[in-house]
Amino acid sequence: GADLRRADLSGADLFGANLRDANLRGADLRRANLSGADLRRANLRGADLRGADLDFSCWPLWCGGLAVKVCKRIAVQLAYHFCKLDCDDPEYIAARNAILDFANQFHRVGERGKLEKIDIAKAPGAGKQSGT
């Protein structure tokens, strides 16, 4: 992948860009259009994505997706996606329910639907120990 460490890409139009395996560590991606960008295995550690558009792209779920500077809009978007997981573990449901008001501020909630609390007592995993 491309070595874009500490690159100034603020405001760049990277719509649909192939950034797979790119090293974007410490890069300035503020207000960048990353809609539809391929961020698989991209290293975003320390990158600044405040104000960036990540719609229809992907968030790296490895160490390269940790410690990324984001704005509330992106945090809400990630929270909404977390809350849409199909997991019946009571600990997950408690965590999910705790952040619902935040997650429902998602900018696409009108088209995706407002999330409602799940009753832990009625969840299929109720009564089971976590991780079993």
Regions found by a protein language model. Give the residues of each.
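Intrinsic low-complexity/IDR segments
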Residues: 1-6, 10, 15, 25, ...
